[in-house]
Every structure is written in C-alpha cells, then in structure tokens.
Regions:
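Juxtamembrane/disordered regions of integral membrane proteins
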Residues: 1-140
C-alpha cells in the first residue's frame, strides 16, 4: 500500500485516539479550567462541527506527514523489515524528542498548566503509537 493511503488511514486512527483521550479520559474537574465551552447546548452544537472538522483535517495531515517520514526513514530503525513494531518505534522516537521533552520542560516553569501538559504528554503518546502501528502495518 502506498504511504499516502496508509497516512490517511493513520490520520483517521489518530483522530479517533485523540477523541477517546480528550473526550473520555481527560474529562476531570482539573481540566475544565483550560477549555471554553459555550453555555447553552445549541451554541455547543454550533461550535462542535467546525472544531471537529478542523481536528479531523489536522489529524489527516498528521497521518500523511508521519507516513511520509516513516517511508523515508524506516531503514534506520532498530526494528528491521518494517511492521507494526517498527511503526511504533518510529512514532515513539518522534514523540520522545519533541512532545515529551517539550511538555516536561514547560511543566517546570508553567506549574498552573501542569495538568494540561500531563494530559498532552499522554494523549500524544497514544495518538502517535496508534498512527505508528497503522503506518507500520500498511507500509511495506
């Protein structure tokens, strides 16, 4: 399968992983101070459609970029021959040197947003590994 199709499928997987993490896991009272939800249900419905479309488009772009990068760099991974484990290794390496260090470093100085940074830390790890697993399975 081409990396473009694999990237689009990985983007859909990342979108659903992101939805589960932010819609079902990180919903406690400590997170309520970081989001602005309109007060009425009708206004919430109006806001949700554009927000979900934007999130979906960004997830597709993310999947394409991840698949393209994986296609070009998979030969340098510890897991040789591709596959789901290679995709997850690639995704975790990207996550570790970018998002993990950024959120840990920001948490040192911005202590009031530490709950949001922790949520970002874990949600991106899940999102990256879901997309990496899909890309590793589909790109040969």
């Amino acid at each position: 399968m081409t990396w473009i199709v694999a990237g689009l499928i990985a983007g859909v997987g990342a979108f659903f992983a992101d939805y589960v993490m932010w819609g079902k896991v990180f919903t406690g009272p400590e997170m309520h101070g970081f989001g602005t939800m309109p007060p009425t249900p009708d206004e919430r419905k109006k806001m949700m459609l554009p927000a979900m479309l934007k999130s979906g488009a960004l997830a597709l772009v993310f999947g394409l970029l991840l698949a393209c990068s994986y296609e070009r760099l998979k030969g340098g991974l510890w897991v040789q021959g591709g596959g789901p484990l290679a995709g997850m290794e690639f995704a975790t390496l990207l996550w570790l040197c970018t998002i993990a260090l950024s959120t840990l470093g920001s948490g040192v100085w911005y202590d009031k947003v530490r709950p949001l940074l922790k949520a970002t830390f874990w949600s991106w790890l899940v999102r990256m590994n879901v997309a990496g697993l899909i890309v590793g399975l589909l790109v040969k």
